[in-house]
């Protein structure tokens, strides 16, 4: 999953698994991406001998519903694995082989948003990525609206046409539907940052009771007085640099 940060761990030579991927292939495959995790598992002998293909949980659900024996991925899910070329709609097999991963694990990639099969006569399309599905389901005017989503992490997403230039990090370009793309800014800590503060306060008070209501009341009081905390919410690092940590100032 996106919260699996094992690929950020440091190996004996002082480099992380993701840094090895970058050095050997030129690709930035961030911790939590499918092939970053697969690379870690492969290097540490954790890939089951009976494993056949790589896919996301949504793709597996489609397989179970339709009875298909091979995963068929929408470009939005394929891109979340890493080593995916959006322009060609294919994975870079050569890059995978450079880090010792078998291209046989690659799933099939769909063109567009086709029906993958049927569940009791009901058509089942390929699964969309969670960011793309959330955008599709919540934004009314895709050409003019932004989607702001705060959960454990946080995301800001904007829909652009296929010819829109690829941005630089920390913005990502992600495949969407009908040939369009999403520009996405993601933080690993959204609501998790508030949960971390609540956990700290609870531990300090040595109580098992949640402290969110008290924190909310203190926040309202601080807004009125102007004595607010300044928080850098990178407590779990960033996708680009997992070693960065957060801070709470003006305590």
Give the positions of each predicted feature.
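Carbohydrate-associated surface elements
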Residues: 4
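Active-site core segments that coordinate phosphate-bearing ligands/cofactors
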Residues: 8, 12-31, 36-71, 82-93, ...
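Conserved alpha/beta enzyme-core scaffolds, especially Rossmann-like or related mixed alpha/beta domains
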Residues: 55, 72-78, 106-108
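Active-site-proximal beta-alpha loop/turn segments in soluble metabolic enzymes
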Residues: 77-80, 117-119
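A structural motif corresponding to the C-terminal end of an alpha-helix
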Residues: 98-105
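Gly/charged, well-structured mid-domain segments that form the phosphate/adenylate-handling core
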Residues: 108-115
